[in-house]
Curated annotation (Swiss-Prot):
It comes from Mus musculus (Mouse). Component of a nucleolar small nuclear ribonucleoprotein particle (snoRNP) thought to participate in the processing and modification of pre-ribosomal RNA (pre-rRNA). Part of the small subunit (SSU) processome, first precursor of the small eukaryotic ribosomal subunit. During the assembly of the SSU processome in the nucleolus, many ribosome biogenesis factors, an RNA chaperone and ribosomal proteins associate with the nascent pre-rRNA and work in concert to generate RNA folding, modifications, rearrangements and cleavage as well as targeted degradation of pre-ribosomal RNA by the RNA exosome. WD repeats lie at residues 144-183, 197-236, 239-278, 281-320, 322-360, 374-413, 419-460. Keywords: Acetylation, Isopeptide bond, Methylation, Nucleus, Phosphoprotein, Repeat, Ribonucleoprotein, RNA-binding, rRNA processing, Ubl conjugation, WD repeat. This is U3 small nucleolar RNA-interacting protein 2. The gene is Rrp9. One of its GO terms (molecular function) is U3 snoRNA binding. There is a cross-link at K113 (Glycyl lysine isopeptide (Lys-Gly) (interchain with G-Cter in SUMO2)). It is found in: Nucleus, Nucleolus. The modification Phosphoserine is found at S50, S51, S53, S57, S470. Residues 65-74 have a biased composition (Acidic residues). A motif (Nuclear localization signal) lies at residues 8-40. InterPro entries: G-protein_beta_WD-40_rep, Rrp9-like, WD40/YVTN_repeat-like_dom_sf, WD40_repeat_dom_sf, WD40_rpt.
Length: 475
């Protein structure tokens, strides 16, 4: 009995919930024995036992508290990183706002400077160097008149062109499509009542700066006022005693200036259908007239060889000399400077404070004729892009020439030539400066000294491609 009890193995109690498993202890003992055995014999088994299982057993185990602490620190770091990122974004936004404010202030300052220079008549934007000569295939030709084009105007929104000719008609064209929008036909002579059209050569036109009124003048001494949108005739101004050769609206108003071969300058109010006053001073037929915002106008005196500035309120005039021939065309560049052309082939730049030209370009379009008898090509039209240094001139030498005015308008340099056959009787820049319109005829607008048979009576739209306008420079 005692022997049986001594040989029987005592049952081991089951491990408690917190006790380490016994198998683990045995495994470690077995592993240790195996290590000892293999360390003596070497071999493949030694490599397997010294791998992951051993490293895992030797690596310190992280408690749950340590893991939670690590996770908690990571969240804090994330919050800190997001906070720094948010602050950086705020800083960048404030910098951008500051840059935008500075840019707006610069823009406002630049605009104010432009306004001051414009009011003083000294604004000169530099655009001429950026103009690229168009290819002949880019020029659009609009045909509809039977005789030579004499004058044209562009609406203030640059969407339509009015052209007039020796055939006594006026045509309104679409700039975009080139189609006729309206035709004002020739009026029959002797028709009873007020004719809704011209019965003689239309020599000049003008459109108000709001695009409401169109004025046209002819050889029969009449000025007709039209509603520009519908081309409906409104009324007729009479009073000139010879052909009406120049018309211009004062910018921002409905005050109309007219000039005539009767040597006078008249002032009208188109909105009120009224005559205001007449000014005298020229000694020969006046050929052309122009005006801007000031209550004054400039005239080209033809054979009397003078350019005159008329101060309407003071009823006074300034007289300028410089050309040697008949001054046939004139155009204001800004309130203080103008350009004129004459039949002696010269183009002149003027400042209102100087009685002589600031710059004079002789033989601006070259010479023609037999050797020893050469004569300069007449300058039949001039145009200027408002408040810039870009000028265009026309003649009958088969080209329109673009010019750059130097600083202070003291120099005139040629830029490029645009091929157009015929008399260039009228030139106008669009207000945006993206195209130039030329009125071409077989004859000069004021006579029939030559006839160019190969020319086509037409309106030509010349695209002007250029880089963005450079910063403003005032003289």
């Amino acid at each position: 009995m005692s022997t049986a009890v001594a040989t029987r193995k005592r049952a081991k109690p089951a491990p408690g919930p917190g006790a380490a498993p016994v198998a683990g202890k045995r495994r470690r003992k077995v592993d240790s024995a195996a290590d000892r055995g293999k360390s003596k014999g070497g071999g493949k088994m030694n490599e397997e036992i010294s791998s992951d299982s051993e490293s895992e057993s030797l690596a310190p185990r992280k408690t749950e508290e340590e893991e939670e602490e690590e996770l908690e620190e990571t969240a804090q770091e994330k919050k800190l990183r997001l906070a720094k990122l948010y602050l950086e974004q705020l800083r960048q936004q404030e910098e951008e706002k500051a840059e935008a404010r500075a840019f707006e202030e610069d823009q406002v300052a630049g605009r104010l400077k432009e306004d001051v220079l414009e009011q003083r008549g000294r604004l000169q934007k530099s655009v001429a160097k950026e103009i690229q000569a168009p290819a002949p295939t880019d020029i659009r030709v609009l045909r509809g008149h039977q005789l030579s084009i004499t004058c044209l105007v562009i609406t203030p929104d640059d969407l339509a062109i009015f052209s007039a000719a020796k055939d006594c008609t006026i045509i309104k064209w679409s700039v975009e499509t080139g189609r006729k929008l309206h035709v004002i036909p020739r009026a029959k002579k002797g028709a009873q009542g007020q004719p809704a059209g011209h019965s003689s050569h239309v020599l000049c036109m003008a459109i108000s700066s709001d695009g409401k009124y169109l004025a046209s003048g002819d050889r029969s001494k009449l000025i007709l006022i039209w509603e520009a949108q519908s081309c409906q005739h409104l009324y007729t101004f009479t009073g000139h005693r010879d052909a009406v050769s120049g018309l211009a609206f004062r910018k921002g108003t409905h005050q109309l200036y007219s000039t005539s071969h009767d040597r006078s300058v008249k002032v009208w109010n188109a909105a009120e259908n009224s005559y205001v006053e007449t000014l005298f001073g020229h000694q020969d037929a006046v050929a052309a007239l122009d005006a801007l915002s000031r209550e004054c106008c400039v005239t080209a005196g033809g054979r009397d060889g003078t350019v005159r500035v008329w101060k309407i309120p003071e009823e006074s005039q300034l007289v300028f000399y410089g050309h040697q021939g008949s001054i046939d065309c004139i155009h204001l560049i800004n309130e203080e400077h103008m350009v004129s052309g004459a039949d002696d082939g010269s183009v002149a730049l003027w400042g209102l404070s100087k009685k002589r030209p600031l710059a004079l370009q002789r033989e601006a379009h070259g010479l023609h004729g037999e050797p020893g008898l050469e004569q300069p090509f007449w300058v039949s039209s001039v145009a200027a892009l408002l408040n810039t240094d870009l000028v265009a001139t026309g003649s009958h030498n088969a080209r329109v020439r673009l010019w750059q005015c130097g600083e202070g308008f003291r120099q005139l340099d040629p830029l490029c030539d645009i091929p157009l056959v015929g008399f260039i009787n009228s030139l106008k820049f669009s207000s945006a400066g993206d195209f130039l319109v030329a009125g071409v005829g077989q004859e000069h607008r004021l006579g029939r000294w030559w006839r160019i048979k190969e020319a086509r009576n037409s309106v030509c739209i010349i695209p002007l491609r250029r880089l963005p306008v450079s910063p403003v420079a005032g003289s």
